[in-house]
Amino acid sequence: MKKIIAQAGFAFAEEESGIHYWDESAYYSFTPEEIEDDIEAPTNEIAALCLELVEKAIAEEAVFAAIGLPLELQDLARDSWKRGDGTLYGRFDLSYDGHGPAKLLEYNADTPTSLFEAAVFQWGWLEDKISAGVLPKATDQFNSIHDSLVEQWKRIARGHVHFASLRDIEDEVTVQYLAHTAQIAGLKPITLPIDEIGDTGVRFVDNAMHPIDTLFKLYPWEWIVQDEFGGSRSMTSTKFLEPAWKAVLSTKAILPVLWEMEPGHPNLLPARFSDDARGPDLGGSFVRKPCRSREGANVTVVENCKIIETTAGTYQGRSVDQALARLPDFQGNRPVIGSWIVGQKSCGIGIREGRGEVTTNLSRFLPHIIYEA
C-alpha cells in the first residue's frame, strides 16, 4: 500500500521526523451501532445546527461581530447565502471513546484536507486486506465519500470547473482528486496554481485566458479578501466552491456561539471566548486555540489549571477556550475522528492519530473498519 501511496504523489507521507503519515500498522474497529448512532447521526445533527448558525449570523449583526468575520467578507457571505450557493464538502473533528457521545472539537468548513486518504487510501487498504484473507469478507467501512462527491458535483456544477490551490503537495493532491471526481460526474475540470489566476477587471481567467465560471479554491476565504483580487469586480462573475457563506463557519469562533445556541447539547463542548468572563465555567480544564489557525498551531491544553501541552505557531488574534475532552488513549496513541459531510450529509470518516491531545501536521492517518461478529 505504501508503494501505491508514493505513486499517488504523497511526498508528505514521511515527514522529516521519520514519522509515517499513512500508518497501516494498526486500524480502528467500530460496530455498526457506534457508527450509525454515535458518529453518523450526530454529524448530521451538528451540520444542521451549523446551517442554523449561518442563518442567525445573516440575520443578526451581533453574531457576525462575535464570529469576527471580516467586514469585506460579510456582504459576500450574505449574498452567497441568499443565492443558495451550493456546498461540496466539510469535515468535523470529533473526540470519541466508544463509551459516551462524540464531542465536536472543531469544524473544517472551508478548506478541509486529508480527503484522498479517507476516500481512497483506506478503502484500498480494506480491499487489500479482505483479498489477502487478513480481514473477513463481511468487513465494511464507513466510507461512501467518493461516490457522494461524484453525485454532489452533478447537483452543484456544470461544464468547466477550475481547481486551484497553493503550490503545496498535500493541497495539490486534494485538488487533483476532487478534479477526478468532477470528471467522473461529467464535468470538465481544469487545474492550476492559484497564483496563475488572472483578472481582466471583468472576469477571472486561467493561464490560457479561458474565463473561470466556477472555481474550486483550496484557499481560505479570509486570505482571498486580503489579496489583490478580493475587491475585484470579477468576484461577482465566478461561482466559488466552497461558497462565501462557508466563511461564517470556518473559524473556531463558532464553538462558543454553537454552545450558546444549544447549551447542554450532548455532542457539543462548553466553550467561551478567552476574553469573555461571561461564558460557561470550564473548571480549570480547557483547550485554548486561536479562532483562526490551522494544523493544530498555537494551541494550549490546560488540565486542573496546569498547562499540559502547547504547540508552536504564528497565529495570533482572538482565541476561544473549549472544555477539555481528553482523547482516548490506545497504548499512547490518541485518535481524532474526522467525520466527513458531502453536501450536508454524513458519508464517512478518517482517523488521525498522535501522541498528544492536539492533532498536528505530523499526526498519522490510520484506516478503520466496521465489523459485527
Predicted regions, residues:
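Preference for protein termini
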Residues: 1-373
